[in-house]
């Protein structure tokens, strides 16, 4: 048996193993880059930039805060001027007088604040805010705390009335509105938004405020502007539905101006027939609105006829003939009571 040697396997050359040299690490303070390619000098510069940026941001925040406080103070002063008469000495002086009064009485009572503001919740709110800011700036901590509590009490008790006065300050603060008329309109508006909408009652009150011909139309216009401002405010004094109901009622009641002119003309003719007649047109129209809203009966018609026409039958008939057109005009659904705006279910 012949023995055969195994075949020779090919020998392949082996590549030599390279020696791995460790990377040189940056020595602190040498300025050489580290493993991430960032040198200590770059880190220092970045840290300094962060500090500078933070300082700039803080300065901007302080400036913005200071400007916001100044802007708020200016707006508070402007609001106070709209609420007060042109002869007033200013918000700062009013706030100091209020603080002096409360310190003398040793009691920051809400009733005293309202008395100082002539019973106006909006004025009291503005002056209290200014007085509290003065106390804070003066470092009077106890006075500041007392005024804060009084302000909270005012907001809880007269929140809607105060908000109504603030929201409508610009509408009622125009230069063509005298102080007496401004006060009357603001009081009427506060009453109108503090309860259920009563368009008839509001219109009758506006008629009663007329001192000279044409003033009712101006009052009606100013009241609509006030409602529009209140509706657009961030925090309205009443619900949007209630304010829209009042707006709709006042808008549809613009024809009352025509009714007033008709009453003036009718009463003017009747005074020639009945010299003892002393009824003025606003009072006569208010009476007619009340009668038509409740349903005018025979006895009421007879009493009114005798009162206006006098004792002579021909004068009474003349009054009834002149009254017919006015009575038909006053029978408007918008004057019969609270009404929902169009498109709303009863």
Swiss-Prot record:
Keywords: Hypersensitive response elicitation, Protein transport, Transport
Role: Involved in the secretion of a proteinaceous elicitor of the hypersensitivity response in plants. Also required for pathogenicity on host plant.
Protein family: Belongs to the HrpJ/YopN family.
Gene: hrpJ
One GO term describing the cellular component: outer membrane
Protein name per the record: Hypersensitivity response secretion protein HrpJ
Keyword Protein transport: yes
Biological process, per Gene Ontology: negative regulation of protein secretion; protein secretion by the type III secretion system; symbiont-mediated perturbation of host programmed cell death
InterPro entries: HrpJ-like, T3SS_LcrE, T3SS_TyeA-rel
């Amino acid at each position: 048996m012949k023995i055969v040697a195994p075949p020779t396997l090919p020998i392949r050359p082996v590549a030599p193993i390279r020696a791995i040299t460790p990377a040189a690490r940056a020595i602190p303070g040498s300025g050489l880059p580290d493993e991430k390619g960032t040198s200590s000098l770059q880190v220092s510069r970045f840290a300094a930039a962060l500090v500078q940026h933070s300082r700039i941001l803080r300065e901007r925040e302080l400036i913005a805060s200071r400007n916001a406080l100044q802007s708020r103070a200016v707006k508070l002063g402007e609001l106070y001027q709209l609420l007060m008469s042109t002869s007033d000495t200013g918000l700062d002086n009013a706030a100091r007088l209020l603080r002096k009064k409360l310190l003398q009485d040793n009691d920051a009572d809400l009733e005293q604040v309202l008395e100082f503001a002539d019973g106006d919740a909006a004025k009291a709110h503005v002056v209290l805010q200014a007085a509290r800011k003065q106390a804070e700036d003066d470092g009077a901590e106890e006075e500041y705390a007392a005024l804060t509590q009084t302000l909270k009490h005012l907001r809880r008790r007269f929140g809607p009335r105060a908000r109504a006065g603030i929201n409508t300050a610009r509408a009622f603060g125009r230069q063509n509105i005298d102080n007496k008329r401004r006060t009357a309109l603001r009081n009427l508006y506060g009453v109108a938004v503090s309860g259920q909408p009563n368009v008839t009652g509001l219109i009758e009150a506006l008629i009663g405020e007329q001192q000279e011909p044409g003033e009712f139309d101006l009052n009606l216009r100013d009241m609509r502007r006030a409602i529009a401002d209140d509706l657009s405010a961030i925090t309205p004094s009443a619900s949007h539905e209630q304010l829209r109901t009042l707006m709709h009622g006042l808008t549809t009641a613009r024809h009352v101006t025509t009714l007033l002119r008709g009453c003036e003309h009718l009463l003017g003719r009747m005074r020639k027939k009945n010299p003892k007649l002393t009824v003025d047109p606003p009072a006569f129209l208010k009476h007619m609105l009340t009668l038509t809203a409740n349903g005018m009966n025979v006895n009421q018609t007879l009493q009114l006829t005798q009162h206006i026409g006098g004792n002579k039958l021909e004068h009474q008939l003349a009054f009834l003939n002149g009254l017919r057109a006015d009575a038909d005009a006053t029978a408007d659904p918008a004057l019969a009571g609270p009404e929902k705006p169009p498109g709303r279910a009863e």
